[in-house]
Amino acid sequence: MNNARPIRRALISVSDKTGIVEFAQALAERGVDILSTGGTARLLAEQGIAVTEVSDYTGFPEMMDGRVKTLHPKVHGGVLGRRGQDDEVMAKHGINPIDMVVVNLYPFAETVAKEGCTLADAVENIDIGGPTMVRSAAKNHKDVTIVVNASDYHRVITEMDANDTSLTLETRFDLAIAAFEHTAAYDGMIANYFGTMVPSYGENKEGDEESKFPRTFNQQFIKKQDMRYGENSHQAAAFYVEANPQEASVATARQIQGKALSYNNIADTDAALECVKEFNEPACVIVKHANPCGVALGKDILEAYNRAYQTDPTSAFGGIIAFNQELDAETATAIVERQFVEVIIAPSVSAEAMEVVAAKKNVRLLECGEWTTKTTGFDVKRVNGGLLVQDRDQGMVSLDDLKVVSKRQPTEEELKDALFCWKVAKYVKSNAIVYSKGDMTIGVGAGQMSRVYSAKIAGIKAADEGLQVEGCVMASDAFFPFRDGIDAAAEAGIKCVIQPGGSMRDDEVIAAADEHGMAMIFTGMRHFRH
C-alpha cells in the first residue's frame, strides 16, 4: 500500500489553532493517542479530548517561561526513530514512536508587524522547539507524518479513512516538503527582520546600519502554474505568487475561461490592471507589450473602452484590456465583435458578459475582485549576478501638489487632462510621452532613447488615427534636459505640458514654454519605468 504507515500517536502543538479542535477530535475518534503542550493541550482538554501533556510524558516540566517544552529525547527520539532499525534503542530508553507531528510556529510576522513591537517582543516570538520538531518529522517522513498547514487536516483524515488509519509515503513526502517550505519561510522572515538592523556584508556599508532592506533578501513565492514557455519559446517558465497576497492583482485573479495564461499574458495583464487602478471614474486601459496603447475614461466602461480603442486600433489588436468596474454584456459584445483580444480583466464579470465572451472560447477572461488600497512592498529586477530591490512606485500627485512654472496658467480642463495624462505616463516605458485631451489618450510614445523621438512617435500615432493633437496636454515621465522637446511639442500643437522638472536647464525649458504660450506644470516626482 505504497509504504503506508498507521497513525497511532500524534503530537499536537500549534500557535494558529484554526480547525485544530475538530482535527484532534477526528484523530481521537480513530484511536490516535494525543500528546500536546501548553495552550494547545488546555484547549483540547477543555473540549473533552483525551490528551497527555508532553511534560507528563517526558517526566520533565516545561521551564523558562515555556522556552523549553519539547526539546527532550523522548520527544525527538520518538519522531526521529527509524522503524525497524532503532526499535531496540527506543525500547531501552522508554521512547515511544510518534507517528504524526502537527505543529505551526509562533506568529513572528504578526508580532513584528504590530505598532510598538520591541526587540524583546520579536525575540520572544522566535520559535525554537516548533521548527526543531517540524524538521525532525520532515526528515523522518519515511515513517512519520508532519502537518503544518490547517488546510491539510481534511486531506489527512480522508486518507486515513480510506487506508485503515494509515497514510502513504507519497502523502508523507508531500507534507514533508510543505514543512521544509514552512520553516524556510519562517527563518527567512526572522533573517529579514533582524537583517535591517545590521550593516551589509559588502564593502559599501555607509548609511545602512538602519535600513528597510535586510542584509540578505529572503522571499518565498508559491508556484501557481508551469507554462508552455517564457517570454520566448526557447525559455522555460513558471508563475509564482506570494503566499498571502492582500491586494487584488493578476496573481489573485480567477480565470473564468480561455486558454492558459502565457508568460507575456501575465506580464501585460499586470501592466494593464495596475494602470487602470489609478482611476476612480469608469476607465479602460488597453496594453500591448507592457505599454498602454489606449487609455480613456467615460460615463461608463463601454464609452471608456470605445475611446481607449480609438487611440490606436492597430496596436489594440491582440492586446490586453483592463477595466476598473464590472464587465457588462454590452461592453463585452463591443469587444468581441470589434477586435481580437488576448485577455480581458475586470474586478467582476456579469453572468451576461460571461455568456457573450464564451462565444470566443480562446479569450482569457479574468476577474480579480475589488481593490481598496494598494499594499506596500518591493519591486525586484534581476541582473546578471544580482537583484535590484526598490519600493513599489506608489507615488502619485494630486492637484494640490502641482506647481505651475509658466507665465500662462493652465485652464481647469488642462489641469484635469494633465492629471489624467500623468497617471498614464507612469505606466509607459521610458522615455515616455503621452498626449491626451478630454480624459483620453491621443498619442503614446514609449521606450525611446530620446525623449524628443518619443514625442514625435506620439504625434505620428495620433496622425495615423486621425486624432487632433492641437490643444492636447503632454505628459513626460521625466524632465526635459533641453528645450528641443518643448519646441517639438509646440510645433505639434501641444498647449500644456506636465513633467517632473529638476533639470539643470529648467529655466531654459520654462522659457521655451513661455515663448510658445504654453502652460507648464511641475510635479516634482519622476516615474521612470524600464
From Swiss-Prot:
GO terms for biological process: 'de novo' IMP biosynthetic process. Its EC number is 2.1.2.3, 3.5.4.10. Pathway: Purine metabolism; IMP biosynthesis via de novo pathway; 5-formamido-1-(5-phospho-D-ribosyl)imidazole-4-carboxamide from 5-amino-1-(5-phospho-D-ribosyl)imidazole-4-carboxamide (10-formyl THF route): step 1/1; Purine metabolism; IMP biosynthesis via de novo pathway; IMP from 5-formamido-1-(5-phospho-D-ribosyl)imidazole-4-carboxamide: step 1/1. SMART domains: AICARFT_IMPCHas, MGS. It catalyses: (6R)-10-formyltetrahydrofolate + 5-amino-1-(5-phospho-beta-D-ribosyl)imidazole-4-carboxamide = 5-formamido-1-(5-phospho-D-ribosyl)imidazole-4-carboxamide + (6S)-5,6,7,8-tetrahydrofolate; IMP + H2O = 5-formamido-1-(5-phospho-D-ribosyl)imidazole-4-carboxamide. CDD domains: IMPCH. It holds the Pfam family MGS. The keyword Hydrolase applies. GO terms for molecular function: IMP cyclohydrolase activity; phosphoribosylaminoimidazolecarboxamide formyltransferase activity. The keyword Oxidoreductase does not apply. Keywords: Hydrolase, Multifunctional enzyme, Purine biosynthesis, Transferase. One of its GO terms (cellular component) is cytosol. Residues 1-148 form the MGS-like domain. The IMP cyclohydrolase activity resides in the N-terminal region. NCBIfam families: PRK00881.1 (NF002049), purH (TIGR00355). Belongs to the PurH family. HAMAP family: PurH. This is Bifunctional purine biosynthesis protein PurH. It comes from Vibrio vulnificus (strain YJ016).
